Amino acid sequence: MNLTSPKVSTMFFDQIITVTDHNVTWEKIQNCLYNLYGEATYNSWLSSLKFVSSRNGEVLLSVSTRFIKEWITVHYMKKILSLWQSEDKSIRSIDIQVIEERNSNFNVILKNREESNHNLGSPLDPRFTFDNFVVGKPNELAFTAAKRVAESIDPILGSNPLFLYGGVGLGKTHLMHAIAWHIVNSPSAKRKVVYLSAEKFMYQYITALRSKDIMLFKEQFRSVDVLMVDDVQFISGKDSTQEEFFHTFNALIDQNKQLVISADRSPSDLDGVEERIKSRLGWGLVADINETTFELRLGILQAKVEQMNMYVPKDVLEFLARNIKSNIRELEGALNKVTHTSLIGRSMTVESASETLIDLLRSNHRSVTIEEIQKKVAEFFNIKVADMQSNRRLRSLARPRQIAMYFAKKFTQKSLPDIGRNFGGRDHATVIHAVKQVENFIKTDSKFADEINRLKKMFK
């Protein structure tokens, strides 16, 4: 009997060699991606990619979630394909499939994503709606912009992000909550809204890093339809939080999602915040909320009294509106104190209100001297106090001098001639001209108006 060697197919061995070759290629590409994008980006997005197979010029990779797949496809796929083709010219395309890691902690959490997203943000205050926001000239632009964003299903061109800024207690948070309430209760479209403070964003980011749930953090924040971050100035000087905020911002803008941000100052004045973030915060509509006027303060008090279903004499409301100028919170707090006097049997009069609020009124009427104004304005513009009295007409000196005159007229009881005498013996006509110049610039130059608002806070 002739014994012949059996035929052994080489196909199986060819497949082993092919898979091994492609694994080596994939390792090279991973090293290239690491060197190209750096450790942070690689670990955040690309390290989760796994090689599955290669057949007929098509490479198949896998990741654990659809979100990661979409992100890599949009931001890194061209580069991955280019790197692979430089190693193997037969490769025509790369596809990514989602293979859930069912036993991983990450996916257990994702099954409860709705609950997780619900806990992602901060609770909304039911008092803060558009209906009970009192509108006046100082907040008209911010209110209109906020309502347009809330009512629009898709981001409005030129209003993404919407950036609201103004001093403490002027209504920024009220508008933020109002936007969120309107969207949540809108029957036309169910959008996922997350509202939170910048401080909470930072602490959630730190928690995610410590618990190694950073991918969950990214997916949660980058899968919302509307992200609202209050008091963004809090991330000033916090480099790693700024880095994550920057990438979250970009991811949402790329997906055409709406952002609403608030701060106590304009984007350009956010000291300690990276320039690239400040630039992006100013991409859309920047709306400031100015200090309240007498009319607006009176309107707020009247609305509050109506809401409380109480009677407060008109002269008492006018007294409060005229004397409590700092912010809306203090104004409403003053009203609450005054109304409580009726609970102990005292009538609400201007006299009783004055007695009840004596400490608050004293702080709101702190006297400011012309010398103090000159010193603070000079420090702000980095000039000498002596330049305030000099006759030099350089623009770098004349403008600060005019601003100091404007504040002297606004914050002191001095007559125009008295003010002029404190500025190198100038006459009252020069003071009037200076005040008008400053008022005109405030109306026409937003950057100038910001400087005035920042200076104004120094005298309070």
UniProtKB/Swiss-Prot annotation:
It comes from the Bacteria. InterPro entries: AAA+_ATPase, Chromosome_initiator_DnaA, Chromosome_initiator_DnaA-like, Chromosome_initiator_DnaA_CS, DnaA_C, DnaA_dom, DnaA_N_dom, DnaA_N_sf. It is found in: Cytoplasm. CDD domains: AAA, Bac_DnaA_C. Pfam families: Bac_DnaA, Bac_DnaA_C, DnaA_N. GO terms for cellular component: cytoplasm; plasma membrane. Residues 91-122 are annotated as: Domain II. Residues 1-91 are annotated as: Domain I, interacts with DnaA modulators. Keywords: ATP-binding, Cytoplasm, DNA replication, DNA-binding, Lipid-binding, Nucleotide-binding. Residues 123-342 are annotated as: Domain III, AAA+ region. GO terms for molecular function: ATP binding; ATP hydrolysis activity; DNA replication origin binding; lipid binding. ATP binds at G169, G171, K172, T173. SUPFAM superfamilies: P-loop containing nucleoside triphosphate hydrolases, TrpR-like. One of its GO terms (biological process) is DNA replication initiation. The keyword Mitochondrion does not apply. Residues 343-460 are annotated as: Domain IV, binds dsDNA. Domain I is involved in oligomerization and binding regulators, domain II is flexibile and of varying length in different bacteria, domain III forms the AAA+ region, while domain IV binds dsDNA. Plays an essential role in the initiation and regulation of chromosomal replication. ATP-DnaA binds to the origin of replication (oriC) to initiate formation of the DNA replication initiation complex once per cell cycle. Binds the DnaA box (a 9 base pair repeat at the origin) and separates the double-stranded (ds)DNA. Forms a right-handed helical filament on oriC DNA; dsDNA binds to the exterior of the filament while single-stranded (ss)DNA is stabiized in the filament's interior. Belongs to the DnaA family. NCBIfam families: DnaA. Oligomerizes as a right-handed, spiral filament on DNA at oriC. This is Chromosomal replication initiator protein DnaA. The gene is dnaA.
